[in-house]
């Protein structure tokens, strides 16, 4: 919005000011997470003779040269190396600014989003979806802790949000797409169960083989019962090997 008495299309820096370093106050980190929408873009002529369009960085307020970048949705600041949106997000998307100043893009119906930076990994709760006009300032998200647990993957070591409220279940890591067990009680319990069932079925098969040999020579259908007993026992032992070899993932902090 233009100031009183100043045309919104007038240059931010007058031609008589020369090469002046922007004197905007330093960026102060807000506590609340913000869903960031780009301002309505207006090409602003720079003080040089070429009239190159520029825009202020949303993080450090430095001027960003937009020459040759007007087709992009976001541009990168050469001072702080952070991204600044210059166009509205694609249809069905929205911008979110993480407290570490990383600009993220997600679906406009998303409730949570994770920061991909290794030194942050923050889970951002976006709160209920609201349609915000572009002219309005960015609205802070609700400061609500996510309902779930941060879990360290047993395969890749990355942290992800696990939404189950009980332990000893399986979880799929969104980073490596592999399945692991949250806690070790469930795999051990199922491994012992399948070993017991497999050995029982194999012993039954051995008993049938020894005890019904003469009967099987007259009634060949008896061989089917042998095969079923051995097959069920083998399947149980294979499942026991699966549960015995599964990786364990452990929770970091619980917010539930």
Swiss-Prot record:
Residues 1-25 are annotated as: Disordered. The active site is at residue 106. Residues 13-22 have a biased composition (Polar residues). It comes from the Eukaryota. One of its GO terms (cellular component) is lysosomal membrane. It catalyses: a 1,2-diacyl-sn-glycero-3-phospho-(1D-myo-inositol-4,5-bisphosphate) + H2O = a 1,2-diacyl-sn-glycero-3-phospho-(1D-myo-inositol-5-phosphate) + phosphate. Residues 1-10 have a biased composition (Basic and acidic residues). Catalyzes the hydrolysis of phosphatidylinositol-4,5-bisphosphate (PtdIns-4,5-P2) to phosphatidylinositol-4-phosphate (PtdIns-4-P). This is Type II phosphatidylinositol 4,5-bisphosphate 4-phosphatase. It comes from Xenopus laevis (African clawed frog). The lineage of its organism: Eukaryota, Metazoa, Chordata, Craniata, Vertebrata. The gene is pip4p2.
